[in-house]
């Protein structure tokens, strides 16, 4: 119920997929298990915008989640979707929510366009306050400064951040988990989710 954040519980809720899969190989993630390999397939921007427009026009649904693992991976794709939503006059009506990696939100122009197109929330996979733990799970080489800068960059464009953290990754220690809590407190994002790592067969 992310739309309740703004105090407007009247709208419905829907989900629209604009891509499938992920090109990364984070060791804790099973998104690519069904496909046997890392990769991503994109729906066309016209298709994505048309689905969102139909939800607004035909069902008065303006609270829409885009559950793609890597929505911000391809700035060209993101811009194309945003332009189509703006051209349809939907930006001011929408409350969109999407997911991204820390190292895919460096494009200021893209973030500004996303806000204009109706994106109000971005879920960021931070996972751990320890660079060693992140690297050990193939999460990326970014450090805590990169994490903080990415969060502030997104927020500066009027987009709320939902931060995601995981406890119990293979290299996690008590000290690393304390660092994760400290980072979460320091960032103080609008929302935070804390998960426990789970082994899967």
Task: Locate predicted features.
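Radical SAM [4Fe-4S] cluster-binding motif and immediate context
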Residues: 1-162, 182
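Flexible glycine/acidic-rich beta-alpha junction loops that bind and position SAM and/or redox cofactors
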Residues: 24, 75-76, 132-137, 167-175, ...
């Amino acid at each position: 119920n992310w739309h309740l954040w703004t105090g407007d519980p009247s709208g419905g809720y829907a989900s629209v997929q604009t891509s499938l899969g992920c090109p990364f190989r984070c060791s804790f993630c099973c998104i690519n298990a069904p496909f046997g390999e890392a990769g991503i397939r994109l729906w066309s921007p016209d298709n994505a915008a048309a689905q969102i427009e139909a939800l607004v026009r035909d069902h008065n649904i303006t609270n829409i989640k885009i559950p793609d693992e890597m929505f911000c991976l391809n700035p060209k794709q993101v811009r194309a979707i945003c332009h189509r939503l703006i051209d349809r006059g939907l930006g001011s009506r929408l409350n969109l929510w999407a997911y991204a990696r820390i190292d895919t939100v460096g494009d200021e122009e893209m973030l500004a366009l996303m806000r204009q197109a109706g994106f109000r929330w971005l879920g960021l996979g931070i996972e751990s306050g320890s660079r060693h733990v992140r690297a050990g799970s193939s999460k990326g080489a970014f450090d805590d400064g990169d994490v903080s800068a990415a969060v502030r960059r997104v927020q500066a464009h009027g987009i709320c951040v939902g931060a995601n953290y995981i406890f119990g990754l293979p290299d996690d220690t008590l000290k690393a988990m304390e660092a994760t809590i400290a980072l979460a407190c320091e960032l103080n994002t609008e929302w935070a989710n804390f998960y426990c790592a789970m082994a899967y067969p």
